[in-house]
Amino acid sequence: MKGSNIRRWGAALAVVIIAGAAYWFWHDRGTSGSGAPAAGQGPQGPGGARHGRFGAALAPVQAATATEEAVPRYLTGLGTVTAANTVTVRSRVDGQLLSLHFQEGQQVKAGDLLAQIDPSQFKVALAQAQGQLAKDQATLANARRDLARYQQLVKTNLVSRQELDTQQSLVVESAGTVKADEAAVASAQLQLDWTRITAPIDGRVGLKQVDIGNQISSGDTTGIVVLTQTHPIDVVFTLPESSIATVVQAQKAGKALSVEAWDRTNKQKISVGELLSLDNQIDATTGTIKLKARFSNLDDALFPNQFVNARLLVDTQQNAVVIPAAALQMGNEGHFVWVLNDENKVSKHSVTPGIQDSQKVVISAGLSAGDRVVTDGIDRLTEGAKVEVVTASSGEQAQPAPRQSGKHGARS
């Protein structure tokens, strides 16, 4: 029984020894078959990352070069598109609406016929006024002929002086009647003209407010249609009161200030116009001031009551040092960036940021054009550490990026 146990333990030990030898053989063979790292480089780690002198993998980072650009300075505010002019087209006379001469949404010119009121009664009134005028003109002409005869007869005492004066008064009276008749004719003609309702301004016609055949009057507040002038069109937007001095200073420079209208999401520029005016008082409730910009809007990109984001260009900073916004970091001591030297070693530089948006930021101090800054992989960095500069390509493993030479050193 004891000998049997010894044999079983011996067999198990032999199996373990054989398995260990096989593992050592295949492991040593796989190691010798792999390529040796290049001289001066550590062995590659998982994913192809290079190792340092003591076997530690170099941190992969992405980098960008600081550039020198002309950077515009914008003041931004929320705005609403408003028509340059809005007119409710109403009838000036009472009558039946015979016809409409526009398509809803159509662009019209000032003077274009929009609607026609039944002119029948106004034609009759004009004819009556013209008839009365003709009658009174004949009376005046007869009175003047009589006056001429009286002036001759008074010289021979065939008529008295009083009769002459009476005739002169009759001529003056008849002349006054004719003037009144002429005014009545003009009034009747004006009433007739008003049966043709025309566009008072250039603009876009809205939806009709009344249908053909309805009796309308000059007192109707609804009107026939609303006309809005959209060529040009305005944008009214607000800025905080702290921006007033900047706007006024830019206006005093004597050049037109450009205003951009962006969509609700602030991702697409809709149109570009010019600042038209600045309101004369601040809204005490909101602490803001209203501004109005005008756009040609020939492409009809802006529509009345549309919400937009307005950007007012007040200045352009020349020769500004610009880096990607992702490179700018914030720490306990303020803003900083990680700068790469020619050996791909990183160092932390304190900087003073200036104008910035979601993509770029201007560095007012602490950096020079040509400096390389880290934009990704920042959380793995330590002062003086050597890194691997890579570029990320969609769907592929990051590859080493070509090193860009440039001016280095902090900008004071």
From Swiss-Prot:
Q: Which GO terms describe its cellular component?
A: efflux pump complex; plasma membrane
Task: State the membrane topology.
Answer: Peripheral membrane protein
Q: Is Cell membrane given among the entry's keywords?
A: yes
Q: Where is this region: Disordered?
A: 33-53, 389-412
Q: Which domain of life is it from?
A: Bacteria
Q: Please give the subunit comment from the record.
A: Part of a tripartite efflux system composed of MdtA, MdtB and MdtC.
Where does the UniProt annotation place the signal sequence?
Answer: 1-21
Query: Subcellular localization, per the record?
Result: Cell inner membrane
Give the disulfide map.
none
Entry's family note? Belongs to the membrane fusion protein (MFP) (TC 8.A.1) family.
Name it.
Multidrug resistance protein MdtA
| UniProt GO MF annotations | efflux transmembrane transporter activity
